[in-house]
């Protein structure tokens, strides 16, 4: 799940869903990993993929038919999903405070967040390599 740990004002509150977010975080039957990383890493500005690449097209349309770098929140979540502990550390020494004031403690094996193992510049290079290279 993408969202901030302390009173996230975007991902966990969109569409007036704070109570739904609370229910999901409390009752989801498998481990949940929270990621709030990527806001300081801009990727995708040098897309060298083929013109029919869906990644290239998404960046192009997002920026009104031009190429610019974008914050990498989504890319961090995907990178964790496919590369996992090789690129991030799972931690549970914190808690989440939702906008409605509810506090949820992290629990090993159930509710974690990820912490970086590398510098933002290193993540930028990895993500750009994966999304910007030409198809082979």
Regions found by a protein language model. Give the residues of each.
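N-terminal acidic, glycine/proline-rich low-complexity segments
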Residues: 1-136
């Amino acid at each position: 799940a993408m969202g901030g740990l302390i009173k996230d004002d975007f991902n966990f509150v969109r569409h007036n869903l704070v109570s739904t977010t609370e229910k999901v975080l409390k009752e989801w039957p498998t481990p949940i990993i929270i990621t709030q990383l990527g806001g300081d890493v801009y990727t995708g500005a040098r897309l060298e993929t083929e013109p029919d690449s869906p990644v290239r097209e998404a960046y192009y349309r997002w920026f009104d038919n031009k190429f610019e770098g974008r914050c990498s929140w989504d890319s961090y979540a995907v990178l964790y999903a496919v590369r996992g502990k090789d690129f991030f550390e799972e931690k549970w020494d914190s808690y989440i405070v939702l906008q409605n004031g509810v506090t949820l403690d992290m629990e090993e094996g159930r509710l974690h967040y990820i912490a970086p193992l590398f510098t933002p510049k290193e993540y930028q290079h990895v993500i750009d390599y994966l999304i910007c290279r030409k198809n082979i």
